[in-house]
Regions:
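Phosphate/dinucleotide-binding and metal-coordinating scaffold of catalytic cores
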Residues: 2-341
Length: 341
């Protein structure tokens, strides 16, 4: 009997040691995994922090906290949009169509509807539509709008402008971009931040971005003359076809297939001086595209050089994509110059 008890004790002791060995092994493996995960997270956070220009994580956290509390003291200007229910439902329908499709197509989703904009106690008639191409412009309760003022009304000196989630333009980065361009004599858009309410609901802080009108030229001390681009409609139709898995020829949606055109072309062509400048500008764009003339023959090379240098500085490569870039025709030098956008 004592022998059996001794054997039982030895078996229990062996099992106990085996359990602790397994437990220690599991704890060791778990610890290694946790340390590995924390190392990866730390590395990712450090990489993100460095990409934002901070030397270490603490500087980043300290700045974010400081900026947050500074932001609570801000008192941005406010506008109020009133959209009748019938018109609001049209916007909702267009928004849902674009979300289902995966891209905003202006011919399908760009219907302007009447509304009222109130600013500093003054109510002004406007027309607005959904704005943008990518669906980040259609976030819940943060839709982007293109707005055009009616008659002689102006908002902050602008006849046409957009309001959009600041994140669609990199928050403060876009404001800095335009300020730098303006300082170097490049045509720059008015770009501000405001608080927006829609039908009595606060939709938060929006970025206001000027559109391409004569007021833009006046604000940049330029003579009235065409602002031009290469029409990107075929490019976006091609993007839509790709989303639908429809085969199409990419060459029909490239820079070489896009028609050069001017903003407010129909209105401008009624003015003989504007029309003459328009024809000169189109000829320059076509000659440059077909490589019949050099870049320096088509552009104010000093302004173009500064434009590209600043784009490199701020990482704004999207501004030189052919579907985004805009040009102004200088009627004195008979050359094109870039418009910051």
């Amino acid at each position: 009997m004592p022998l059996k008890q001794n054997n039982d004790f030895t078996w229990i002791k062996r099992k106990k040691h085996s359990f602790f060995r397994r437990r220690n092994l599991i704890l060791l493996i778990t610890g290694i995994i946790i340390i590995g995960i924390l190392t990866l997270i730390s590395s990712a956070v450090s990489g993100f922090v460095r990409s934002k220009g901070y030397s270490n994580t603490w500087d980043f956290v300290e700045t974010v906290i400081s900026n947050y509390f500074s932001g609570t003291k801000a008192s941005p200007e406010t506008i109020s949009l009133q959209i009748e229910n019938k018109e609001y439902k049209k916007l909702e329908k267009n928004r849902q169509q674009a979300l289902d499709r995966g891209v905003i197509v202006n011919d399908m989703d760009g219907e302007f509807v009447p509304a009222t904009l109130e600013y500093k106690g003054k109510k002004m008639s406007i027309k607005l539509r959904l704005k943008g191409h990518m669906t980040d412009h259609l976030q819940e309760d943060k839709w982007s709008f293109r707005i055009k003022m009616s008659g002689a009304n102006r908002f902050m000196g602008m006849k046409r402008f957009s309001i959009q989630h600041p994140g669609t333009r990199g928050y403060l980065a876009e404001w800095i971009y335009h300020e730098l361009m303006k300082r170097e004599g490049i045509i720059a858009l008015r770009y501000k931040f405001i608080e927006v309410t829609v039908n009595g609901r606060n939709w938060g802080i929006y970025a206001v971005e000027e559109n391409f009108e004569n007021e833009l030229l006046e604000n940049n001390n330029r003579i009235k003359s065409p602002i031009l681009r290469f029409n990107p409609d075929l490019y976006w139709i091609n993007r839509l076809n790709e989303l639908k898995d429809v085969n199409s020829f990419d060459e029909y949606a490239t820079y070489y297939s896009a028609n050069p055109e001017a903003y407010r072309e129909e209105e401008g062509l009624k003015d003989s001086t504007w029309k003459a400048n328009y024809l000169k500008a189109i000829a320059l764009m076509e000659s440059l595209r077909s490589r019949k003339i050099s870049v320096s023959q088509a552009f104010d090379i000093d302004k173009l050089s500064k434009f590209h240098a600043l784009i490199d500085l701020v990482g704004g490569e999207h501004s030189i994509d052919w579907s985004d870039i805009k040009y102004y025709f200088d009627p004195i030098k008979n050359k094109l110059e870039p418009v910051a956008y």
